[in-house]
């Protein structure tokens, strides 16, 4: 629809990759900016036996396929791959909990989304599992999902994202304070909110340079443009309309807040097609290796 009407879409959430539209600017993480780094961290920290669980639609299928590839590269094993409805309730996770008990994986990789996320984490807690030994690791469990669960259910689990509400940089703190000042002190500030924020700035700057709201002119100005976002300086890759981002991994503490456990301080060039699906290839932008 966007292309047929010569429009322009900004997409602020992570996604499964393998897509391109010249009429879309992708500001969320591509798989080589979150999945790859998360796989490396989990394999080196917890072990190589994974159980995959996701919501029943395209993103989890593709995300789990990529994670399985990375795990196999790390000489790991996929013990099971299970899917639940998009609006899954406690009963939908009974089989998942049963399989976890039977297989005892080192890591549970979750691509469960939305309100079902808290149901999974609460079921995990009720089963008495120990996140210090067998965490749930995710790309889709953000501050927004954590806000819907008890802190005790969140504690110890892992998420990879380019931005966390607790990011310590001055720019991040200023952004979070402004966000909560507008939407309330309890409003969660996930990576998608940060991406939505900086993409508006990129769009308005491109619009000003173009001097017109014609999408073609704005697109021309957007490609290769940069902005000092809360996560770090981001850039639109002119090759694929995706964004150079700063990967991070965090663990949830007893208060249900993310605490960074891995931050290489490098900006990663987007590779939405995962041309090189290797645990050793980060596509690092060597010009930007400043810790944020």
Residue ranges: model-predicted function:
Residues 3-25:
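Flexible loop/hinge segments that line or gate small-molecule binding clefts
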Residues 4-6, 20, 74, 132, ...:
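Short, structured coil segments at secondary-structure junctions
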Residues 6-8, 49, 133-135:
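Proline-centered loop/turn at the N-terminus of a beta-strand
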Residues 10-12, 27, 139, 160:
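Generic beta-sheet signal
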Residues 16-17, 23-127, 166-174, 199:
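Extracellular/periplasmic Venus flytrap/periplasmic-binding protein
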Residues 52-55, 187-194, 215-218, 234-235:
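Surface-exposed patches in mature extracellular/periplasmic domains of secreted proteins
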Residues 124-197, 208-213, 262-291:
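Extracellular/periplasmic periplasmic-binding protein-like sensory domains
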Residues 223-292:
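Solvent-exposed, acidic/polar segments of extracytosolic/periplasmic ligand-binding ectodomains
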């Amino acid at each position: 629809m966007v292309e047929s009407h010569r429009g322009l879409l900004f997409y602020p959430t992570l996604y499964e990759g393998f897509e391109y539209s010249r009429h879309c600017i992708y500001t969320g993480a591509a798989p080589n900016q979150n999945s790859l780094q998360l796989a490396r961290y989990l394999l080196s920290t917890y072990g190589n036996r994974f159980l995959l669980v996701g919501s029943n639609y395209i993103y989890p299928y593709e995300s789990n396929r990529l994670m399985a590839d990375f795990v196999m590269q790390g000489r790991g094993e996929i013990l099971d791959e299970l899917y639940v409805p998009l609006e899954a309730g406690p009963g939908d996770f009974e089989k998942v909990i049963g399989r976890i008990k039977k297989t005892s994986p080192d890591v549970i990789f979750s691509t469960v989304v939305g309100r079902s996320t808290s149901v999974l984490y609460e079921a995990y807690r009720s089963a008495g599992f120990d996140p210090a030994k067998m965490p749930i690791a995710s790309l889709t469990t953000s501050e927004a999902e954590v806000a819907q669960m008890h802190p005790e259910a969140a504690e110890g689990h892992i998420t990879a994202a380019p931005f966390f509400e607790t990011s310590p940089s001055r720019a991040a703190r200023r952004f979070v304070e402004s966000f909560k000042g507008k939407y309330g002190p309890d409003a969660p500030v996930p990576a998608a909110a940060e991406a939505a924020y900086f993409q508006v700035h990129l769009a308005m700057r491109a619009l000003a340079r173009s001097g017109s709201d014609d999408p073609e002119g704005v697109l021309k100005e957007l490609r290769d443009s940069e902005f000092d976002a809360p996560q770090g300086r981001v850039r639109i890759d002119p090759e694929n309309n995706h964004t150079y981002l700063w990967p991070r991994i965090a663990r949830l503490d007893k208060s249900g807040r993310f605490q960074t456990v891995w931050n290489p301080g490098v900006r990663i060039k987007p590779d939405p097609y995962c041309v090189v699906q290797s645990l050793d290839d980060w596509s690092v932008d060597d010009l930007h290796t400043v810790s944020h």
